[in-house]
Amino acid sequence: MIYRMQYRTAALVMVIFALACAAGCSSPETAAPSVPIITTEPTIIPTPESTLATVQAADMALQLTDIPPDYILRERSVMTSPEVTQLTRDLGWRQGYFVTFDRTGRSRNDQTRIRQSVNIFPVENMNKVFTLEKVALSEGETPFSSPYEIPFPTIGDQSIAYRMTNTPDEGQVTYTVIFTKKNAFERITMAGTSTDYETLKDIAEMAGAKIL
């Protein structure tokens, strides 16, 4: 009797243990919390634009195709050190180039000239070069007229334009534009009896675009 009760008790314990094991095995495991993956975008550092022109002064010069068709090419040449002033050399002048175009109208007295000069300096001297040239232009009075600043599109890094009557004869006018871009300084003049302000603006913008 005692053995039978012990047997039943042991059997009951085994059944309970088996059920507990089955319940434990069948219960789902607790899922580990998901950790978000953070991706870092690469930092893009813009390449700074060069402050030095990548083309030679001769390649910045205007071409005949840039000028109205009634002009002819008169002269184009490199500039040499003796052709520039001592002050220009003191400012570190390195090289230069100039080109001249002429136009003759229906009469011998109707003549107009476009001249461009390109000069290369150390980039750290460009502000000084521009300031000195601007002062020289603004103070360039003649017995007949004084230069005065005129509205003009911004060309390059710094630019300014002047208009002046050269002689007592009506119609003789000189426009002068100076500008800097990178380490290049340019002066463009249009002088004569058939000057054209709008044409000058187009020419100056083309000249500025040639400095790369």
Give the predicted meaning of each segment:
Residues 115-117, 178, 185-189:
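Structural recognition of the beta-strand scaffold that forms the well-ordered cores
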Residues 111-115, 170-176:
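Short, surface-exposed coil-to-beta transition loops
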Residues 1-43, 47, 67:
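Secretory targeting signatures
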Residues 95-134:
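A short acidic-to-branched-hydrophobic micro-motif
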Residues 145-174:
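Signature of long, low-cysteine stretches enriched in small and polar/charged residues
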Residues 183, 187-212:
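Surface-exposed amphipathic alpha-helical segments
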Residues 72, 122-125, 135-138, 205-212:
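Sec-exported extracytoplasmic/periplasmic mature domains
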Residues 33-105, 142-155, 199, 203-204, ...:
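N-terminal "mature-domain start" segment
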